[in-house]
Amino acid sequence: MTRRLFILITIMLCLIPALLHSQEGYREVTAAGTHKLTLTVDSPRRLGGSDAPQVARETAEALQFDMVLAGPFTVTAPSAAAASAGIRPGEFDFAPWRGAGVDLLVKSGYTVTGNAMTMEFRLYNVTQGKEILAKRYTGRPGDVRRIAHTFSDDIMAALTGERGPFTGKIAFVSTRAGAKAIFLMDYDGHNVQQLTKNRSINLNPDFSPSGKEIIFTSYRQGNPDLFRRELFTGAEARISSYRGINATGAWSPDGKTIALTLSKDGNSEIYTISRDGKNPHRLTNTSAIEVSPAWSPDVRKIVFVSDRLGKPQIFIMNADGTGVRRLTTSGNYNVSPRWSPKGDRIVYSRQEGGFQIYAINPDGTNDTRLTSEGSNEHPRWSPDGRFITFSSTRGGGEGIYVMRADGSGQTRVSGGKGRDSHPTWSPRW
């Protein structure tokens, strides 16, 4: 399946079956007189057990947030005239939903018995009166948002051929607890938890490819050292503690290697180390400052920042340090590059008064500005390459935002006191 770019579903209703049953995965289809598909999330129903209005509310809220961000749909509120108690085929009439202009319908129900919960979801093609997808999940009432996000991922798989990233987490840096600490939250801002509690400065979190670990830089012992943390146990290990900077660590996509910035030999240079911090290998060797390495998805190249030409610019080199070439030719201050998981785009920040986020092809073409409001930094891709998370000062303070890969749908997801920055999106959980 080679065509899994972000889907802009603007499609004639008569083409829905072709979309859903394509053997080639996602297809981008446009035609004169077409319209964006209308999707409605009906109110979740109690199928048995105890009444749990919070489960119903959070289910609908999470599904609607996911589908609005997804972008291919016009998401509408459920029609009171069309609403009915049934969620399974034969338990409700499609005609009122057609009359309300609905193309795709999500129905769901729950059964809560004590601390056990079963949730059932259905996705329907209203135009044809057919069921597209049916799923059942078990868990606890506290799992409701995770389960709803899981079904959103399944919706994207059914309609595009690739699962969504909505079960992912975002790790970020925040001052909400005082000193800069690493926090973790659902991608939509819910279920926030503080990871580091060392009362020191902690920066630049990055997820392992498995999503089970992060690396980050901490000043807890005075020097900016690189640490690795297991997310499920909380166990931490210092893996790079050379004198000077041990920072901007980035896991390779195969999980075997970490690229980072070290200043142990003088100025800041790009190195690689093994996942346990051994076998340091220097990749750059200039008098310039070189920082912020990030891997290509095939592990063959590294994009990084260097001021070897006087101002910070983005460069690309082979993973062994050879074949260095300049990527950005516009702007005088370009930083924080990150390669798309699909390999087709590199996102970065450019200083233009404040900072704005750009995306560029790896060959240097199609350099496109994605943000304009406030100062925007630290862009990172979702695991499917359809979305980007970043920090922004718009609206006062500094918060974490998400947007589609083309810059549309910019939405704040972090709240509360303090300044939030340096987000990174986990692999699917």
Curated annotation (Swiss-Prot):
Location of this chain's protein in the cell: Periplasm
GO biological process: cell division; protein import
Listed Polar residues bias regions: 363-374
Chief site of localization: periplasm
Top-level division of the source organism's lineage: Bacteria
InterPro entries referenced in this protein's UniProt entry, alphabetically: 6-blade_b-propeller_TolB-like, PD40, Tol-Pal_TolB, TolB_N
Entry annotated with the keyword Cell cycle: yes
Region entry Disordered, spans: 362-383, 407-429
UniProt keyword list: Cell cycle, Cell division, Periplasm, Signal
Endpoints of the signal sequence: 1-22
UniProt GO cellular component terms: periplasmic space
Role this protein plays: Part of the Tol-Pal system, which plays a role in outer membrane invagination during cell division and is important for maintaining outer membrane integrity.
Subunit structure: The Tol-Pal system is composed of five core proteins: the inner membrane proteins TolA, TolQ and TolR, the periplasmic protein TolB and the outer membrane protein Pal. They form a network linking the inner and outer membranes and the peptidoglycan layer.
Name of the molecule in the record: Tol-Pal system protein TolB
Organism: Geobacter metallireducens (strain ATCC 53774 / DSM 7210 / GS-15)
Gene name linked to the record: tolB
